[in-house]
Amino acid sequence: MKKIILVIFAIFFTTNLLAHSTNIDFNSKDNCTKRKSMLNGIAKLKTHKGGEIIKFNSYTGFDQRTVLIDGHLKNPIEITGYLQLPKGNDKVPIVFYTHSSGGPGDYVWNDFVYHATQNLLKNGIGVLFIDNFCPRGARATWRDQSKVPLINGAIDAMMALKVLQSHPRSNGKFGTTGHSRGGTNSFYLSDVKFTSKFIEGTKGFDAILPEAAECRMA
């Protein structure tokens, strides 16, 4: 039962698609370099202010097999996340959102992501956005998925989880979701063989909700 609590929240509170327009003046090219995460620019937008930029150590891997044999440990990298929390000081559960092949610009232009975030925050759930692309030299991977192999979204999520477990506002409950490529990332995070490479035992995410993941994963 505990495992599905965050999934129920995610389904129930992400239905409002009114009132927000994707017509936001935001230059993704100028805000995305290996040394500059797009999330730094997004955090300054009027519609997205009030969160906390979090930098954490991660790794770049080629596929799931390379992680299982610790091959990813040869390629360390610093990743940026943007954490938005409900008002107040209460400890809260946190949902990780992973962007699609469109890159972290999803967090600005995608109405669904915006309203999902607002509804979760209103109902006492924090949201962490992660930029899997800019630090690895990509803004989007529509034309070439090999620019940033799929597994890296899952690696980043697990490394972020290790950091947020000790965040003063965290109640120790975590969920993960994402659309398309981000949904595929959620499937990776359901594999205990994978998650146990980062956290001992079976303790990973408490709830997982893939959205339009790859058919081969589903």
Label each region the model flagged.
Residues 24-90:
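N-terminal cap/lid segment of alpha/beta-hydrolase-fold proteins
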Residues 91-101:
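Short beta-strand element of the alpha/beta-hydrolase
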Residues 151-218:
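Primarily recognizes the serine-hydrolase "nucleophile elbow" in alpha/beta-hydrolase
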Residues 17-21:
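Boundary at the C-terminal end of the N-terminal hydrophobic targeting segment
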Residues 101-114, 119-122, 128-154, 163, ...:
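Cap/lid segment of the alpha/beta-hydrolase catalytic domain
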Residues 4-13:
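Sec-dependent N-terminal signal peptides
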